[in-house]
Regions:
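Charged, often Cys/His-bearing segments associated with DNA-binding zinc-finger transcription factors
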Residues: 1-27, 81
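Short, surface-exposed loop/turn segments at secondary-structure junctions
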Residues: 24-30, 231-235
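Short, amphipathic alpha-helical "recognition" segments used to contact nucleic acids or chromatin
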Residues: 33-48
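Short, well-ordered secondary-structure "scaffold" segments embedded in the functional core
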Residues: 55-67, 73-74, 78-255
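Residues within the helices of the helix-turn-helix
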Residues: 52
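Glycine/charged-rich beta-loop-alpha catalytic/anionic-binding loops adjacent to active sites
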Residues: 21-23, 36, 200
Length: 255
């Protein structure tokens, strides 16, 4: 239901309880106990049900669901920040992979450049770094879905944070042909009017084999359905929600 094991959820709930005075003696009584409220928040990130449906399921109002999301998601982010930073630091000791996903967000009034011609829907371009085992280790700041991966790679902060990997003598950062020209390892580009050599073909096959791991990592990240089936909340909140989901996925995979 939450995307986490029972042990992982228990630890997270205990850490959140330290930071949140949930049952304060003053103020309005809570509709749900803290552990149940935390289940609700994780459930919505994992399954992306409408908030009114979640309210029906858990026996509280839609307004209460919204309030718990706004209150608990930042706390989850804080609790998991140290672990996420440690995992990212460890990942810098080996080769890495990068790819982009476009998280659907729908059309938004007054917001331009969300439409991805490649994906054929409106979304946010999210740059994802994975280790060679196919687990997410870093995610960049989101940008409009119309932005090419090569540009989003630079704009999102990923290029700078992983620059040492694709400098001479670096451990290597590999991407698909959408990253050609950025300096990272990419498939060989076929020149017009020239046949691709057997060596180039084998090189491209080896790059594809390596890149399969980042595709697995993105599939795991998109199991948090809020990044797959349509983000409906305020677009201004998307970067924060993305950071929280990224840390939850890192915790799920490494915790």
């Amino acid at each position: 239901m939450t995307g986490l094991s029972a042990e992982q959820f228990a630890w997270l709930a205990a850490e959140v309880a330290v930071l949140v005075d949930w049952d304060a003696p003053t103020g309005r009584p809570r509709s749900l106990p803290l552990r149940t409220a935390l289940v609700v928040v994780l459930f919505l990130l994992r399954h992306n049900l409408p908030e009114d449906a979640a309210g029906e399921l858990f026996g509280c109002s839609t307004a209460t669901i919204w309030r718990y999301q706004e209150e608990l998601e930042p706390v989850i982010d804080v609790v998991l920040s140290v672990l996420a930073a440690q995992i990212t630091a460890q990942a810098h000791r080996d080769g890495a992979l990068v790819d982009g996903l476009v998280a659907p967000v729908g059309e938004r009034d007054g917001v331009e450049h969300l439409y991805s011609g490649k994906k054929r829907y409106c979304g946010q371009n999210v740059q994802v770094v994975a280790n060679l085992d196919g687990r997410v280790v870093d995610v960049g700041e989101p940008y409009p879905g119309s932005m090419y991966d090569s540009r989003a790679f630079e704009a999102s902060g990923i290029a700078e944070r992983w620059r040492a990997h694709y400098q001479p003598g670096g451990l290597g950062l590999t991407g698909d042909k959408g990253y050609q020209g950025t300096g990272i390892i990419t498939p060989d580009k076929k020149q017009p009017g020239q046949a691709r050599s057997d060596t180039a073909k084998e090189y491209n096959r080896s790059v594809s084999r390596i890149r399969a791991a980042v595709e697995r990592a993105i599939a795991h990240l998109k199991n948090w359905k809020i990044l797959k089936t349509g983000y409906r909340r305020a677009l201004s909140d998307f970067p924060r929600v993305l950071r929280t989901v990224t840390k939850l996925e890192i915790y799920r995979a490494f915790g």
